[in-house]
Amino acid sequence: MNLLKPAVKPPSWLLAELTYRCPVQCPYWSNPLDFAKQEKELTTAQWIKVFEEAREMGAVQIGFSGGEPLVRKDLPELIRGARDLGFYTNLITSGIGLTEKKIDAFAQAGLDHIQISFQASDEELNAALAGNAKAFQQKLAMAKAVKAHGYPMVLNFVLHRHNIDQIDKIIDLSIELDADDVELATCQFYGWAQLNREGLLPTREQIARAEDVVHQYREKMAGTGNLANLLFVTPDYYEERPKGCMGGWGAIFLSVTPEGMALPCHSARQLPVEFPSVLENTLQEIWYDSFGFNKYRGFDWMPEPCRSCSEKEKDFGGCRCQAFMLTGNADNADPVCSKSEHHGMILAAREQANCTNIQINQLQFRNRANSQLIFKG
């Protein structure tokens, strides 16, 4: 450990965003809006070097994400490399492009965990949100195949105003598939979700109803062995205090983008902060010594009202990316906090959710064509 910063612990979780390529077009994905101009991807050898450096520092878990990580032909090799180093390995996938042959290959490579995402509980809505008419049946087949290969079935449903009212059907589908773990995560408003926020943010009434449904199912499932873990994540737009984002800036989590930029969270590349590349620096140098990773560590950077707040060690001042997106200054208090001078922006978004009538086909979908239009415009 760098003796100049003895209080900084090493990262425990590495997210390898292998690619921005993806066969689905979810309008809520957290990838950057200008992903289409990010053409380069780290090679197999470069990724393995990243894994080696992260493991040497003490990281214990790695997530393979994207885009869709399945489009990388070297995925089995990357899994094997990470597993041989002692990582707990997790594949985060849409299931599109997954086959039983690939599941076999991943198992042989040592993959520990597979999470498959769904857009909805029925084929029509799933197709509308994914931009892929065949996605739903493929996801069903692969969820069953993952279970048949001895993996726990871990499902993720991203919730928003267009599908949250079918949360009971979503849970029923999870029970029908004999899922072990289900994450019902209301979309977090970064990247494409922030672009489409007006058309995605549920109303407070929708959130309350969904919470009641989840509570009823938890009571019903208690003791049955079904859905041992049913997690419901609500949007912080209906909270009065911000989330402790990533467990603190540069405290636990380290993400590497397809072209090798190292970030303290998924969305930080949008900030007016210079972040280093794994092609030019070691992870040790990046984690302990880089400007980007030290920018919002600890509490010294905080302005008021965060600096004197008794809750700062719990929420770390909230989300820097959200502060930047909403106020234009990442140093500001997260507007979710009722103590923030910008909290009115959150109140206005809640009110807007009660009035909007944006339909699914009016959302801006995450695809290369839309991305090119955005960054060229």
UniProtKB/Swiss-Prot annotation:
Gene3D superfamilies to which the protein is assigned, alphabetical: Aldolase class I
A biological-process GO annotation: pyrroloquinoline quinone biosynthetic process
Recorded metabolic or biological pathway in which this protein acts: Cofactor biosynthesis; pyrroloquinoline quinone biosynthesis
SMART domains found in the cross-reference section: Elp3 (SM00729)
Molecular function via GO: 4 iron, 4 sulfur cluster binding; cyclase activity; metal ion binding; oxidoreductase activity; S-adenosyl-L-methionine binding
Limits of the Radical SAM core domain: 8-224
Function of the molecule: Catalyzes the cross-linking of a glutamate residue and a tyrosine residue in the PqqA protein as part of the biosynthesis of pyrroloquinoline quinone (PQQ).
Assembly, per entry: Interacts with PqqD. The interaction is necessary for activity of PqqE.
Protein name per UniProt: PqqA peptide cyclase
Species this chain originates from: Rahnella aquatilis
